[in-house]
A protein has these predicted regions:
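Acidic, metal-coordinating catalytic segment for phosphate/diphosphate chemistry
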Residues: 310-404
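A glycine-rich phosphate-binding loop feature that marks nucleotide/adenosyl-phosphate handling sites
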Residues: 147-150, 230-231, 286-297, 336-347, ...
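Short small-residue beta-strand/loop micro-motif enriched in glycine and branched aliphatics
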Residues: 72-73, 300-304, 351-352
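Short, hydrophobic beta-strand segments
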Residues: 107-113, 303-306, 357-361
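DNA-contacting surface of Y-family translesion DNA polymerases
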Residues: 7, 183, 191-336
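Gly/Gly-Pro- and Ser/Thr-rich, intrinsically disordered tail segments characteristic of DNA damage-repair
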Residues: 1-227, 237-240, 278, 364-404
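Short, charged/polar surface micro-motifs in flexible loops or helix N-caps
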Residues: 13, 36-39, 297-300, 346-349
């Protein structure tokens, strides 16, 4: 028997939450911006009227204003968004114990074993959930209904806002295969460009490729994308309540060439810290400590860890702390073969605290600016893929220094 999977996507989530406090702006173009006072701030979200004007997530404010001069800009309130996300998740949990969050505004629900309790009609249940969220919270959803997670997500993207799309065994080829290959889960900008070089523009063309060819071209990701395009995704929906609490978030890499200068090492650390910080923000976690492991060409590992002054999920904080630890373990020009950066002593964002800096009263303002910057980076990557933007500290400062 096929599974029944929903993918629920809150429409224009940030903007929709803001409009609950500004109902008078509901019919005018509105965008939530990382820094509304700056022309170079980034659009984090927009409502439907702004979307109809051509405003796009992750573009700069001046670009959006050029398209839509009467665009109303509102500041972001991330704590409020997390509160509404929890309220929506509480509704989902009443329909199944298999609900998996995918970011702050998306969730998969496996209702295979509970559908009979709500009438047995999948589309009717999806519509009922949409109507309940709208009635109780004032927010709208798009819901995809399908027999696997990948197609359910394609369904929620297929028709917006406030809609339900069913992708079934009978119709999936006619709906899915004509779509651009970039619509498929985990096909980022680099993968789309690579596939395009081989004439693969649609999901159907991807499905027609030989699995062995894709594996040669893209490694394990090629095999995975082949399965996704052919309706073979079997990944389970993982219940939030059953998930093991995350105790650490880390990333490590072996470099193509040994690192011997501080500039090279800081660039490598920044790349790793970027990955760690991005995941922390996605999981709603803060790091209370940092650990660094340094490996030399003889495969000798040395590690050190320390408590951070205050919990953080910011790239800059993690990069600075990890670099300081590395310099305790390493003296240039001794070669470094590999590095690992791990965030430890994690806490949910609601439990994190910020320690006042008595010697630097501007520290809070700097953190707020950095939070806006990294939120903008998250928005750009969500829209254009993980490789769409690189944190500046990950670039070499001196010409001739190789990138890690």
């Amino acid at each position: 028997m096929d599974r029944v999977i929903f993918h629920c996507d809150l429409n224009c989530f940030y903007a929709s939450v803001e409009l609950l406090s500004h109902p008078e702006l509901r019919e005018v173009p509105v965008a939530v911006a990382g820094d509304p006072a700056s022309r170079h701030g980034i659009i984090l979200a927009k409502n439907e009227p702004a979307k109809q004007c051509g405003v796009k997530t992750a573009e700069t404010i001046w670009q959006a204003k050029k398209k839509c001069p009467n665009l109303v800009l509102l500041p972001a309130h991330h704590k409020l968004y997390r509160e509404y996300s929890k309220k929506v998740n509480a509704i989902y949990d009443e329909y199944t114990d298999l609900a998996e969050s995918f970011g702050i505004d998306e969730s998969w629900l496996d209702v295979t074993n509970t559908l009979h309790l709500f009438g047995g009609d999948a589309k009717a249940l999806a519509n009922a959930i949409r109507q309940r969220v709208k009635r109780e919270l004032g927010l709208t959803l798009s819901v995809g209904v399908s027999f696997n997670k990948v197609f359910a997500k394609l369904g929620s993207d297929y028709k917006k806002p406030d809609a339900t799309t069913v992708i079934s065994r009978e119709n999936w080829r006619s709906i899915v295969w004509p779509l651009p290959v970039g619509d498929l889960l985990y096909v980022g900008g680099a993968a789309q460009k690579l596939l395009g070089q081989y004439g693969v523009k649609t999901i159907g063309q991807l499905a027609a490729c030989k699995k062995e060819t894709l594996e040669t071209l893209m490694g394990k990701m090629g095999t995975q994308l082949y399965e996704y395009a052919n309706g073979l995704d079997s990944a389970p929906v993982r219940a939030r309540l059953d998930a093991e609490p995350v105790k650490s978030v880390g990333n490590g890499t072996t470099f193509p060439q040994n690192l011997t200068t501080r500039i090279q090492v800081r660039s490598g650390i920044a790349v790793l810290a970027d990955s760690v910080a991005t995941r922390l923000r996605r999981e709603g976690l803060y790091a209370g400590g940092i650990q660094v492991t340094v490996r030399d060409p003889a495969f000798h590992d040395r590690s050190r860890q320390k408590q951070l002054p205050a919990p953080t999920h910011l790239i800059l904080d993690l990069t600075n702390a990890a670099m300081a630890l590395t310099e305790e373990l390493w003296t240039p020009p001794a070669p470094i073969r590999a590095l690992t950066v791990t965030a430890i002593h994690l806490s949910p964002d609601g439990e994190a605290y910020e320690q006042a800096d008595l010697f630097d009263p501007t520290a809070g303002q700097r953190n707020a600016r950095q939070e806006k910057l990294e939120s903008a980076m998250d928005a750009i990557r969500k829209k254009y893929g993980g490789d769409a933007i690189v944190y500046g500290a990950a670039r070499p400062e001196k010409e001739g220094d190789p990138l890690p």
